[in-house]
C-alpha cells in the first residue's frame, strides 16, 4: 500500500498526477463500436488569452461531465482547441509593433502575418497549459486551432457552398464600424452602454415659407451628411410642407422634406433629420425615397476632406461604383477633425448662426465595440453578408421540436429572440489576421470569382490578373463550424465524424448565445443536416464577493492560477460548482475555497486513518451480509442513495446539487459518523468485527472517491492509488451505481433513531458544559428498544453512558433528572452531580422564555382562521408540526427545571 504524507499538499500532487494521466494516455479517445460515444467540444478560448474565472467554471463543468461519462463506460471525447480571435490577436500584434516604431502597412501583409503566427506560437500554449493546471481531461492529441489546415478547409468549403447557393453576397450596406479597430463588426458584437449625452434642438429654415423646422439630434456632427428631413404624411402640423425643402445650415444646401412613417408624430416635434450614410434607420428611409448617400466620416473616425472626396469621385467617374455606393463630402473647415472635435465646432457655428435653439441633457444607450469599447459608427461600407432568413428557419424549428434543449429551459427564449430578429450577418472584417475571404477580382473585367483555391484565369474574360479580397472573415464564421470541423468535416467519410458527431453537450455562458450558439446550430443543420449537439448547458458568470462583475476597471478580477497556487485546483473546482445552479451567476468566495480545501484535508486525514488501521495482508471486499452490523448497513444504504441521487443530478446538469451531496456524505456520514463508530470495533479485540469494519471502511471510501473524482480529480486519484487492490487509475474505474441488495431501509431507520438520540444527548451535555470525561447512567423510554439495545457500545462511547436501562414507559422519579427527547425515544439522565445547578437553572429559564415566545407565535398563526383557511395546506401542516415540536421542547425544558428543584 502507498504511504500518504501526513498533510495534503496540492503543489506536491497535482502536476505529478496530471503528468501521470498524460503519460498513460487516459484522456485519449477513439471510436469504439462496443461503446456509446459522448462528445463535448470545448468553447475555444482566444489563443492570446489567459485563464480567467469564466474559463475556470466553463471547463470545470465540462470536465465533470466528461470524467463522469468516461467512468460510466462511454467513449467520452472532449475536443480542446483555441480560437484565432481576429480582432484581439491583431490588436496585440499591432501594439507590439508600435513599440518597435512599425505599422502593418510598413511590413506588409506577409510580414505582418509572419509576426502574428510567431505571436501565436509564443503565447498560444499559455492558455492550454493553464487549462491543464485546472485538471481538464481533454484529448490533447486532438487539439485544434481555428486557423489550422482542417478548419481552414472547412471555412473555404462553407463559403463556396453558401456563395453558390446565393446565400453569401457582397454589397454596400449599413454596418457597425469600429473606428479604433478599423473594421466592421456584427450586430451581436455591439455592446450597449448607458452614457450621459444631449439632445441638441436645431432649426432648419424652410425654403418655400421661411419658417423654421425644429428637430432634435444626439449627433449634430452628422448633419453635414443630411440629404433630407422627414415628416409624417399624416401629421396635420406639416401638411402645408409636403413637397417643400429646407436649407441645410452651415452648408447652405437645399434638401427635400419627405413624408415617411419613420417620423413619429408623438415624439418631439415629429421632424427628423435624415443622414442615410450614418444611421441604419435613415439608410432605409433613403432607399425608400431614393435619396443621395453622403459619407462625412472617415473609417478612422475623422471628418472627410478633399482627398477623400476626390477618391470617391474617381470611383464614380470610372464607373466602378456599385449599388448604394456613398458619395463623400469635403467637410471644409471641419475636415480632419475627430468626430467629437467636429461636434464642438459645429455646435459653436450653429449657435452663432441662430440654428441652435436649446440643449437638453439625457442618458442614452450608446453602441460600443465589444473588444475595445470605442463608440460604434454606423457606416455604409462594401462588405460580405450571409443571408440569414433561410438559415435561421431550420435552426428555429430544431429547437421548437425539441431536437436541441437549453438547460435551464428559460434560455430558449434568448435564443429564439436572437434567431427570429437577426439581420443578415456581416462576415467580412478589415483585418489581416484570420481566414482571408476566398474571393478574387479580375483586374481586367471586374468579375468576382469565389473558389477554394486561387483561380489561374478569369472564367469570364480569360484574364490572368486576379487579386484576392484583402478582408478576412468574422472570427465567429470559423468557430460556428467548430463541432464538426474538429471531427474531420468536410470529409464526410471521416471515421471520427461518423462516430462522434453530432456531439452531445455544449457548455457555455449565456453571453454568447447569439454570438456563437445560434451560429453553430444553423451551421450544423445547413452543412451536415444534423443539429450539432442535443443539449446546451448554460452557466452564469462568476462575480466578486460583492456580486459585481469582474473587470479591469474595478480591479476586482480573481486570477484562478493564484487560487490554485494557494489552495489547489481541486479546491477551486469544488468552490465553483458546490451549491451552484444552472444558468445563474455565482459569487467567488475565498471562504468557500477555504472550505473546499478543508474538505480535501478532511478526506486526506480520513483516508490516512483507514490505511493506518489495515494489516499488511488486508484483502478488500465486502463481507457477507450476516457479518454486517446495523451501522454497516446504514452507511452502505446511504452510499447507495447518494450514488443514485448524484447520477440523477448529473443527468440533469445539476452539478451543484451533486457536489453538495458527495460533500455531505463524505464529511457528515463517513467521516463524522461512520469512522467514529468504527473505532470501537477496530479496537474491540473481536477480530471478526474489526475485519468487517475495515472492509466496509475501505469499500465505502473506494466508492466515495469515485463519486467525488469528477469534481476533485487530483486528490481522489492520489488517495485511490493508496487503497489496497486499486487499479492503475481511478479515471477509468466504473462509476458507482445503485446496488439493489444494499437497500437496508429498516436498518437505516433504526440506526438513525440511535444517531438522533446520541446527538440530543451530546447537545444537552454541551449546553450544560458537561465534560466528556464525566459519564452517567441513563434510562431510555422507547416503544422500539431493539436498535438501542444493539447499539449499547455506541451509547457508551458517544452518549457517555455507564449503563443503560430500557423501558416502554418510565414511571420513576424525575428529581435530579434531565430529559432529552427525540421522535423515537426519551432519555432520563441523572445530571445533578455533573453540573453547576444555579448556572443551569438560569440557562433553562432563559431557554424557557424563548420557547414560550416561539410556541405563542405558532399558536397565534393556527388560531387565525384566515391563515388556516387561505394559506397553502402544506404550509399549514408545516406550522402544525413546528407547533408540536415546540410544545415538546417546552415540556422538556419545564421538566428539566423541575428536576433541578
What are these regions (language model features)?
Residues 1-234, 275-288, 292-311, 343, ...:
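N-terminal, positively charged nucleic-acid-binding surface of large information/translation enzymes
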Residues 34-42, 64, 100-103, 128-135, ...:
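Active-site-adjacent bridging/hinge elements
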Residues 54-66, 73, 82-83, 151-154, ...:
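Structured ligand/cofactor/substrate-binding pocket environments in proteins
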Residues 67-75, 96-109, 129, 133-138, ...:
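Secondary-structure transition/capping motifs at alpha-helix termini
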Residues 100-114, 335, 405-406, 561, ...:
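Short, polar/flexible loop-turn hinges at active-site or ligand-entry regions and domain interfaces
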Residues 181, 251, 372, 443-445, ...:
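Short Cys/His-rich metal-coordination motifs, predominantly Zn2+-binding knuckles/fingers
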Residues 200-207, 244-249, 367-371, 440, ...:
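Short acidic-hydrophobic surface loop/beta-edge motif
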Residues 201, 417-477, 481, 526-569, ...:
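Feature 926 captures the class I aminoacyl-tRNA synthetase adenylation module centered on the KMSKS loop
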Amino acid at each position: 500500500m502507498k504511504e500518504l504524507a501526513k498533510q495534503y499538499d496540492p503543489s506536491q500532487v497535482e502536476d505529478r498526477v496530471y503528468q501521470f494521466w498524460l503519460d498513460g494516455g487516459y484522456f485519449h479517445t477513439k471510436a469504439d463500436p462496443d461503446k456509446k460515444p459522448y462528445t463535448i467540444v470545448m468553447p475555444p478560448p482566444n489563443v492570446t488569452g489567459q485563464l480567467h474565472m469564466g474559463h475556470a467554471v466553463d471547463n470545470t463543468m465540462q470536465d465533470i461531465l466528461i470524467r463522469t461519462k468516461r467512468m460510466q463506460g462511454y467513449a467520452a471525447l472532449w475536443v480542446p482547441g483555441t480560437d484565432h480571435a481576429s480582432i484581439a490577436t491583431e490588436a496585440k500584434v499591432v501594439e507590439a509593433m508600435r513599440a518597435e516604431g512599425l505599422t502593418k502597412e510598413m511590413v506588409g501583409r506577409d510580414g505582418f502575418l509572419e509576426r502574428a503566427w510567431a505571436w501565436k506560437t509564443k503565447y498560444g500554449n499559455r492558455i492550454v497549459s493553464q487549462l491543464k493546471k485546472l485538471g481538464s481531461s481533454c484529448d490533447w492529441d486532438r487539439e485544434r486551432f481555428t486557423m489550422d489546415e482542417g478548419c481552414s478547409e472547412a471555412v473555404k468549403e462553407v463559403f463556396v457552398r453558401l456563395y453558390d447557393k446565393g446565400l453569401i453576397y457582397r454589397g454596400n450596406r449599413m454596418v457597425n464600424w469600429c473606428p479604433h479597430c478599423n473594421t466592421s463588426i456584427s450586430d451581436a458584437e455591439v455592446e450597449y452602454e448607458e452614457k450621459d449625452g444631449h439632445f441638441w434642438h436645431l432649426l432648419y429654415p424652410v425654403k418655400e415659407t421661411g419658417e423654421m423646422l425644429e428637430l432634435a439630434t444626439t449627433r449634430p456632427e452628422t448633419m453635414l451628411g443630411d440629404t433630407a428631413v422627414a415628416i409624417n404624411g399624416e401629421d396635420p402640423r406639416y401638411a402645408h410642407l409636403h413637397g417643400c425643402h429646407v436649407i441645410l445650415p452651415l452648408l447652405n444646401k437645399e434638401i427635400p422634406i419627405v413624408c415617411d412613417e419613420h417620423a413619429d408624430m408623438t415624439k418631439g416635434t415629429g421632424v427628423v433629420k435624415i443622414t442615410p450614410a450614418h444611421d441604419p434607420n435613415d439608410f432605409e428611409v433613403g432607399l425608400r425615397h431614393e435619396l443621395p448617400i453622403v459619407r462625412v466620416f472617415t473609417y478612422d473616425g475623422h471628418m472627410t476632406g478633399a482627398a477623400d472626396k476626390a477618391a470617391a469621385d474617381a470611383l464614380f467617374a470610372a464607373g466602378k461604383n456599385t449599388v448604394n455606393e456613398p458619395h463623400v463630402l469635403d467637410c471644409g473647415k471641419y475636415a480632419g477633425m475627430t468626430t467629437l472635435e467636429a461636434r464642438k465646432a459645429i455646435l459653436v457655428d450653429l449657435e452663432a448662426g441662430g440654428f441652435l435653439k436649446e440643449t437638453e441633457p439625457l442618458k442614452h444607450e450608446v453602441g460600443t465595440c465589444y473588444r475595445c469599447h470605442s463608440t460604434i459608427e454606423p457606416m455604409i461600407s462594401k462588405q460580405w453578408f450571409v443571408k440569414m432568413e433561410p438559415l435561421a428557419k431550420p435552426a428555429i424549428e430544431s429547437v421548437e421540436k425539441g431536437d436541441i434543449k437549453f438547460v435551464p429551459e428559460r434560455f430558449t427564449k434568448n435564443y429564439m429572440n436572437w434567431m427570429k430578429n437577426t439581420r443578415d450577418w456581416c462576415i467580412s472584417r478589415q483585418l489581416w489576421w484570420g481566414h482571408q475571404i476566398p474571393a478574387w477580382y479580375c483586374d481586367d473585367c471586374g468579375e468576382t470569382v469565389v473558389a477554394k483555391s486561387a483561380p489561374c484565369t478569369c472564367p469570364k474574360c480569360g484574364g490572368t490578373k486576379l487579386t484576392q479580397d484583402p478582408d478576412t472573415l468574422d472570427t465567429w464564421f470559423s468557430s460556428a463550424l467548430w463541432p464538426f470541423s474538429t471531427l474531420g468535416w468536410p470529409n464526410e467519410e471521416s471515421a471520427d465524424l461518423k462516430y462522434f458527431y453530432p456531439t452531445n453537450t455544449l457548455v457555455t455562458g449565456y453571453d454568447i448565445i447569439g454570438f456563437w450558439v445560434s451560429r453553430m446550430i444553423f451551421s450544423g443543420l445547413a452543412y451536415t443536416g444534423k443539429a450539432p449537439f442535443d443539449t446546451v448547458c448554460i452557466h452564469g458568470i462568476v462575480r466578486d464577493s460583492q456580486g459585481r462583475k469582474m473587470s479591469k476597471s474595478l480591479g476586482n478580477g480573481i486570477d484562478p492560477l493564484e487560487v490554485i497556487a494557494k489552495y489547489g485546483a481541486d479546491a477551486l473546482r469544488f468552490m465553483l460548482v458546490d451549491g451552484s445552479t444552472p444558468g445563474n451567476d455565482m459569487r467567488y468566495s475565498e471562504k468557500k475555497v477555504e472550505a473546499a480545501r478543508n474538505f480535501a484535508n478532511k478526506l486526506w486525514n480520513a483516508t490516512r486513518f483507514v490505511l493506518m488501521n489495515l494489516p499488511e495482508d488486508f484483502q478488500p471486499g465486502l463481507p457477507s451480509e450476516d457479518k454486517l452490523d446495523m451501522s454497516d448497513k446504514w452507511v452502505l444504504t446511504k452510499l447507495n442513495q447518494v450514488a443514485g441521487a448524484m447520477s440523477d443530478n448529473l443527468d440533469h446538469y445539476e452539478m451543484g446539487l451533486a457536489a453538495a451531496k458527495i460533500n455531505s456524505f463524505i464529511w457528515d456520514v463517513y467521516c463524522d459518523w461512520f469512522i467514529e463508530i468504527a473505532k470501537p470495533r477496530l479496537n474491540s479485540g473481536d477480530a471478526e468485527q474489526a475485519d468487517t469494519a475495515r472492509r466496509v471502511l475501505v469499500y465505502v471510501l473506494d466508492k466515495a472517491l469515485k463519486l467525488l473524482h469528477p469534481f476533485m480529480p487530483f486528490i481522489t486519484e492520489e488517495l485511490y492509488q493508496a487503497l489496497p487492490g486499486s487499479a492503475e487509475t481511478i479515471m477509468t474505474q466504473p462509476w458507482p451505481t445503485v446496488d439493489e441488495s444494499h437497500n437496508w431501509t429498516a436498518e437505516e431507520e433504526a440506526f438513525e433513531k440511535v444517531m438522533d438520540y446520541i446527538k440530543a444527548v451530546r447537545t444537552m451535555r454541551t449546553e450544560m458544559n458537561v465534560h466528556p470525561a464525566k459519564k452517567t447512567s441513563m434510562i431510555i423510554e422507547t416503544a422500539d428498544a431493539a436498535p438501542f439495545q444493539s447499539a449499547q457500545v455506541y451509547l457508551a462511547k458517544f452518549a457517555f453512558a455507564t449503563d443503560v436501562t430500557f423501558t416502554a414507559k418510565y414511571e420513576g422519579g424525575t428529581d435530579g433528572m434531565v430529559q432529552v427527547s427525540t421522535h423515537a425515544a426519551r432519555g432520563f439522565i441523572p445530571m445533578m452531580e455533573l453540573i453547576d445547578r444555579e448556572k443551569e437553572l438560569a440557562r433553562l429559564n432563559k431557554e424557557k422564555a424563548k420557547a414560550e415566545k416561539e410556541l405563542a407565535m405558532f399558536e397565534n398563526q393556527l388560531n387565525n382562521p384566515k391563515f388556516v383557511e387561505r394559506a397553502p395546506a402544506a404550509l399549514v401542516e408545516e406550522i402544525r408540526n413546528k407547533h408540536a415540536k415546540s410544545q415538546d421542547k417546552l415540556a422538556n425544558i419545564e421538566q428539566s427545571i423541575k428536576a433541578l428543584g
